[in-house]
């Protein structure tokens, strides 16, 4: 029998979440509508945990911490910005970060670069990029929010770990990627 007769309809692929176009990393897809509905509900309830790794400009004062801001999306210009908590269009944005590695560049005016692990506690439009830039640590390769220039043709932001409960069995599922090769830091030592 041919594949077409064995599978008369194309397979179902349910997109559960998205990544910004220049972001690399792990994505979750559902194999059927029931699983898609369950996973979408888990995502909305914050039961899908997402971690990212990014290379940022500078070195945060603290090696770990939490950023809480309010973001307002500008759909016309495909960007977001920090607004006051009182802004009715502002949505709470929270993330935790941890510095994994730090290095000094070998330029005429040396600067620090840091490899950070970020756990998203909310999922807002361009959240990591906006919040890190607002704190003075824009992402390397970010042409939208890194106004000081970029030293990489690619945005160094990767969704490297995802954790959730299987929609049918309830078993904890966790998926992890290694640090991308193009990242200039990976020793695990913080200066």
Label every model-predicted segment.
Residues 1-191:
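RNA pseudouridine synthases
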